[in-house]
Amino acid sequence: MTPTVSNPFSDPFIDQLRAQRQNVIELTSGRRLALPASVGFCHGVRHAVQLLADTVAAAQQQDIWLLGAMIHNPAVNDYFVKQGVKMLDDHDLDTVFTRAKATDIFVIPAFGLDCELDERLRAFVQSPGQIVDSTCPFVRRVWQAVEQAATTGAAIVIHGKPGHQETTGIWTRAAKVAPAVAIVPSPAAAHQLLDALPPTTPGAAYPPAWLVNADRLPHCDWMLVNQTTMLCSETEEIATILANAGSKHHGAFTMANTLCNATRARQAEAEKLCAQTCEVILVLGGINSSNTTQLYRLAAKHTTTYYLQSPDDLDSHAVRHYLPNEQQWRDSSHWLPPPPATIGILVGASCPDSEIAALIRKLQACA
């Protein structure tokens, strides 16, 4: 689909920063802001948002159903809801078949859909052209790796967050074609999985909801794939743990090339920024955003870090910030360090330029 409308989330100030490759902004207070080389939408998110914007512009008296959040950013999702898009909650996706007409338009989010729902949708619509599929190409690459590995009889191990839409999409496809499947959300879980396999009882002490056919795991080769927004370093650490387990727990082990280029690059840029002397780092993005959460985790290892969902969460006196581990909001006062402090800014790949610009302008005014 050729773009027919301009990006509703673009901002000329951010465009100028990119054009000038400006990563440092000096403030009149003597403080300065430091940004990584890449900010704003990654390619997959930009493509998905543009598809939906074009669909809204082209729709002719047809209802548009968005099957879950387009991306994990409330500013973006709220914008499209105000444009008339009917966005379904992730827990209510099945209701689309009783609420929608077969002639409506249906938009698949950037994360993709679980396998069964995808198949039901394609059987439900009157014409294939009524489905606007914005699934990220890197997510599709994971699906393809799963299907290819399954043809060889390999079990699939997924480094992903249980319950996340993308991981659910990978999981349901793997469960359909592979002899066994396991979700491993962390390196610690990788050790836990190995400890739960023979000679102990298969599946013991490992969450059953993260396993399919656990008894078959020791008898299969293993292929590791990953949710594209996880920490790349942790995916590689999990690969090392599983590979080192050797034939004691499984057959041959391979790691699929499913690390997202944008995720890897942005995490590397975040590490580089964190290595600078930043008195405080602000991370901006949706609190349900996996890639934004990983940026927060990286930054929090280095210095005081605040996770903001909106520029409105901050002023010169206090900051309202999210704690991912505790899944709680907290209000902190006296957050602003004195001049000549450097304030680092990290931005999730689903955070629009308009939000980034609003945060920078607020800091220019209050910091």
Located regions from the model:
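The feature marks the mature, well-folded catalytic cores of soluble enzymes
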Residues: 1-367
